[in-house]
Every structure is written in structure tokens, then in C-alpha cells.
Amino acid sequence: LTAESGAPSAPAPGVMRVVRVSPHRSEGESIPLIMWTVVLALLPAFAVGLYVFGWRAAYVTVLSAASCVGWEALIQKLRGVRVTVADGSAVVSGVLLAFVLPASVSWYVPVVGAFVAMGIAKQAFGGLGANFFNPALVARVFLQFAFPSQVNMPEWPIVAPQVTGLARLAKSVAPGSPDAVTSATPLAVLKANPGAAWEAIPGSQPFGPPLAWLLPAGAAWAVFALLVAFAAAGIYLEATRGKRLAAVAGVGALLLFGVVPTGDISFGLVPGCIGETSAWALLLGGLALVYYRCINWRLPLAYIVTVAVLASVLPTRAGDGSLVVGFSFERTLVHVFGGGLFLGAFFMITDMVTSPLTSKGQVAFGVIAGVMAALIRLYAGYPEGVCYSILLANATRPLVDRLTMPTVFGSRRRAAPARPAG
């Protein structure tokens, strides 16, 4: 099969058949099935985006997805290869691009971003499976510098909190809209003042695991212990008998009821990009991808845990250049739930084309990206580091694959050539 046409060709005698470029699947799952499953898994986050940002969330998302489909079809026509937009990969890139943009951007911002994603980051490298970097994130970086006043704002709009229910869907967060209120994102507030009181962080109240609100303290801890045992049993059954439903159900119940906190900051009712604000919605979609084995759970787990650990133990540089030293549980919660970490962990760093092939490599890849994200958040001038951390990690993927791929039986790794004396 050729990389773009997908048409079978009979190999000459003694010549091996060339198959499609990655991603390769061995479970009877096609690329369109995987891509459209990802689109469905993004629907919970999209629904939250509609509620938080009004109808413009749908406007930007549909425009971005349609632009990616249109640009990819046009470029494939110009290249003289088969148009493959029905596989859903362009739709996934378009939705993810919209999810990392504010809902208030002008119409041309996602259109230009879609061209960069499809034309430069994807088709210029040969199309699906040949790109080295995540197309949506490449476009996001370009837009950040091309339209800084629309993409990097000091204050971000959301529909006013006093508007409730379905009435929020009819409201607009366009510049100057009377239906919108603006404020800094949780990470921006934390970046400017790492020692800020917890109550000063947008969306911080009320806050706590669901069990803490539903049950008395003693009963909550008892149920939490049962959830831990349930999750451990599920992981054991998945590892020994392949019972992935047990693992996903056990870990999912533990996360949703005992770990991931409630509150505006985790439900997504805070300023930010369209699809990144709700940790709960993204976790639901991510667990679905894990269940259907569209992604390897080790990679998002390694990424999130690395960011959480480093945010807990490393000193933080404040906006005035001073260092804030000391552990803060609330500061760690903001780093985990107050930005784009869950969106990047479940839907971007797990891209099959730009992530390593082996489980060991994916763990290493997640740690590398997590270290980069934490360092950017804590010490660079930009409050969010997910986008850059994943792109930088994408550049290390060939090396990670080389170091973690198992050695073929009966072969040896090629030794480096000896340097001449003198």
C-alpha cells in the first residue's frame, strides 16, 4: 500500500510489500475507527466548552474542523494523491486546534491555523503517519506569535456566572459582549503570585473530592479505601487476564469519586481555552480511549504525575523574579487541574504518530514531556507549558524509540565506529 493512496499493489517476485506508514494496528481496528472514536471522546469537553463560553465555542470548533478538512483535501488534490479526509484525522486536528484557542478569536484565526496544521505540519512531511510534530500544537504556536492579542490575552472571557442553564448557550464571549466577564486564568494568577491565597485563584471554591461532600469523614475514608482496593483488583485482572473493563472501571471510580476534586476549577467553569478547562470531562473521554485501547494509559499517567511531583517539590519563580520555596498542596492542584494538562495528556501527547511505540518508551516520553512542562510553568515567562513540552518531546521520539525498542533475537546493536588515533 502506498502512504497516501492506500491502493494495494502486487509486489514483484522476491520483493517485499511496502505497507502504509504508522500508525499500525493489529486488532482489526482501522484508522477511521480510531479517529472518530477520539472525536466522540472529545464530546464531553466540547459540551462543557459550550456551557462556559456560549455559542462561540461551537462556532470556533466547527470552523476549525471544517477548515482542516478543506485545506487537507485541497492540498492532497494539488499533490495528486488520494483525498483521505474521510479517515477523520483532519477533523481530530481541527477540533484539537479549536480546543487550544479562546472562544473569542476572530474567524480567520482558526482558518489560518488550520492551514498551518494541515499544510505545513502534516502534508509537507508526507501526510498522516509521516509528520514529526502534532499538527494542532504546531498551529497553536504559530497563532500565538501571529495573533498575540487574540491568543495570549491577560484576561480571558467566559459567559457571566449569573446566566444559568441553557440560556448560556445563546450568549457570546466576543470582545465587547455584555454577556461576558473577563479574568485571568488560574495558572496566570498563580504565575504572577505563587504565594497567593487559595481563595484568590479563579474557581478555587468550593473544592474537594466528591466523597468529602457526600459522606462524613470516617465513612469517606472507608469508601476511599474500598475504591483503592477496587482499582488495584481491576489493574490486576487487566494485567493477568486482560480484563480491561475491570481496570478502567476501578481506576475510573477511584479518580472520579476519590481523587479528582469537585469545584469550578476542575469542572471547567474558569477562563481558558475552549476545550482545556474541564478535568472531569477530559478524564471521562480519556478513560474511554484507554478502554478501547486507542491510547496507552502509561503515557498520560507518566505525564500528569511528573508535572504534579515537580510542581510540588520545586521552588516557583514569581512574577517579580523572586523564588517561592515550600510545598503547597493548593498550588499543586492548580498545576494539575487549572490548565491544559489533561487535554494534552489524553489527547495530544498520546498521538500514535508522534509518540513512541513501546510501553517503556511511552513512560520515558511522558516523563520527558512532564519535566519540560513543569520547568516552563515554574520558571519561564509563559504560565502554560503543555503545548511546548509536547512539541519538544515530539523531537525526542526517534531517540526514545531507538533506546527502548527491543533488540531483535539473534542480532546485536551496531557499535559506534572507532575514532582514529590522534
Predicted regions and their residues:
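N-terminal signal-anchor module of multipass membrane proteins
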Residues: 2-72, 76, 421-422
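C-terminal ends of transmembrane helices
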Residues: 22, 70-81, 118-129, 229-239, ...
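Alpha-helical transmembrane segments in multi-pass membrane proteins
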Residues: 37-45, 60-72, 89-94, 98, ...
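Structural signature of hydrophobic alpha-helical transmembrane segments
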Residues: 54-67, 104-113, 215-225, 265-279, ...
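Cytoplasmic-side transmembrane-helix entry/capping segments in multi-pass membrane proteins
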Residues: 82-93, 109-115, 130-140, 241-252, ...
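Membrane-interface helix-loop-helix junctions at boundaries between adjacent transmembrane segments
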Residues: 90, 95-174
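Loop-to-transmembrane alpha-helix initiation sites
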Residues: 132-137, 278, 332-341, 362, ...
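Long hydrophobic alpha-helical segments that form multi-pass transmembrane helix bundles
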Residues: 135-282
